[in-house]
Amino acid sequence: MARMLAVRVVAGLAAAAVAALLLEHYGLAGPTTPLPKPRGSQRPHPAPGSEANNIFWGLQISDIHLSRFQDPGRALALEKFCSETIDIIQPALVLATGDLTDAKTKEHLGSRQHEVEWQTYQRILKKTRVMEKTKWLDIKGNHDAYNIPSLESIANYYRKYSAVRKDGAFHHIHSTPFGNYSFISVDATQRPGPKRPYNFFGILDEKQMEELVEFSKKSSQSNQTIWFGHFTTSTIMSPSPGIRTVMGSATAYLCGHLHTLGGLMPVLHTRHFTGTLELEVGDWKDNRRYRIFAFDHDLFSFADVTFDKWPVVLITNPKSLLYSCAKHEPLERLFHSTHIRVLAFSLSPITSVTVKIDGGDIGQASHLSGPIFILKWNPRNYSNGTHTIEVFVQDSAGRSRTAHHIFSAQEDAHLTFDPLASFILLTDHYIVARVLFVLIVLIQLTTLITFRYLAYPELKEPLGFANMTTFSLHILSKINISYYSVLLLTLYTVLGPWFVGEIIDGKLGCCFSFGIFVDGHFLQGGLTFINGIIQLVFFNIPLMAYVCWSLLHRCFGHSFRSHLHQGKYWKIIPVYLLILLLYIWQVYSCYFLHVTYGSLAFTFSPLRTWLTLLTPVLIYRVWTLNSTELGIFMVQLKSHLSS
């Protein structure tokens, strides 16, 4: 009866957890306001040709991380970018997509807003007069929102020192003689903004989503629309229908945040199911990367380049096949174009622009106007299959650069993005983290409860690894001190609170696996679930395994000292090395908590500080259990070994 009850409880918890996750992700919303549909086929003309019209270009820079403690070269390079680079490229607008400042403490673990970093940022903008040369659109990143109790707080230096100085999303329209182009910002920074690390994920609420839907509707009158934000869509938590659906009519979403995963993924680009491109740009902080993009006859092109590397080259026609989408762009204009078109910029005058297709030299492009170079061609000559265009640019100082990509003059041709990049950008990682967290907890609880109510084992087969593991789980689950300790630890990891402290300076809050309560606000969990998984996998479960292992040794009649002198050091030493490393990690997590959230959080942290202190107590208690408590298991082992 008890066994059936336990099974029903676990099954009910599993079903409830899965249902809750699905409902939260997909919602039970009724009919929603229709979103603008992607642009359909447009007129084939005007097509890219021999005139210097229907084209403009801009720049994107992200993750600048101006710091009062780290790498002053970031500020020096940014100043040069705002003067020299802007003067040469002369963009119509610049998108600065977040993390303008670093906002970390000297030891690089804690976080707070440093006014001097923001003053440095503003000084650069004013000194270079960059806002007089171009439209500088800067938005906040998660670092710019560290430790900010409210948007009205004096610590919200973005309002005082940025170029835009307006919190929240906005819709900028770039007007040209040949049409309007919409640039819609997404501000998913958390409100209020907790200290690091728990604001890694962005959050959009219902009101913010409604505002973005309105922007999307208004942008339907524009030639093309670009969305830009700090967070990748995979790190934004948003209610139904989801941020990707809302921006579904856009040509591209330009973002930063992931720093190309520390260089492991130098190209993080993909395409949404709506056809919208998602393009993460490399960080300025360590890699000095930026992006040049252009609309040439409403065809979108871009190139990610390294600061101070000249020439900068962008082929605008024919555009790259990988980044083409008939849903959003008039690709038929490419098929009716009369000229190959290239943008080339350098410190010195451009002297030659050589064009090759499929390895064959087809000629020298001639200078049209400004940075625009053109070369007559016939796209019908390349109407079959895919082809590679290569452009070699050289300036008068001998600097050179080659740009190349695959293109096609067929409407039905397409290429696929890197599957790993698509997984990183298209997966809602907070949903995956929640599901994994729940599954790990359910597996651990099911194992504990099942073995608790199973009949005592009978050892009939040889003592192999599987038999010993099963036997040790029986011991763990049927000895009260070990069973309730592990059960309580698992349940507490789920229910919390993990700690109570100053989530924001002067604002008390509680951190749970499912989110953070601070100053009357609830911030839903994203990174908290990931930390919960790490806690389970790298401490709770190994501790449970070690307790099982220790209890098994006790049943063989060993004490803590005697089991160390069995002579089987090759079996024992790896166990203790692993446990020691994991315990050191737990101790470090206490130190990290103290540095990031202060002494109060360190003191009132059951899952960190208290657990670190209680773990040796549990281990001592296990190794000093009376033989009477282990009696039936010791008898079974002796009986089996003597038979």
Curated annotation (Swiss-Prot):
Q: Identify one Pfam family in the record.
A: Metallophos
**Where found, per UniProt?**
Membrane
Q: What is an example of a GO molecular function annotated in this UniProt entry? A: hydrolase activity
Q: Which residues are glycosylated?
A: 180
Disulfide pairs? none
> Which keywords does UniProt give here?
Glycoprotein, Membrane, Transmembrane, Transmembrane helix
The protein here is known as Transmembrane protein 62
Task: Kindly give the CDD domains that the UniProt entry links to this protein.
Answer: MPP_TMEM62_N (cd07401)
Q: How does the UniProt record describe the way this protein sits in the membrane?
A: Multi-pass membrane protein
Predominant cellular place of this UniProt entry's protein = membrane
Q: Where are the transmembrane segments?
A: 9-29, 431-451, 484-504, 532-552, 572-592
Q: Which InterPro entries match?
A: Calcineurin-like_PHP_ApaH, Ig_TMM62, Metallo-depent_PP-like, MPP_TMEM62, TMEM62_C
The record's Gene Ontology cellular component field reads: membrane
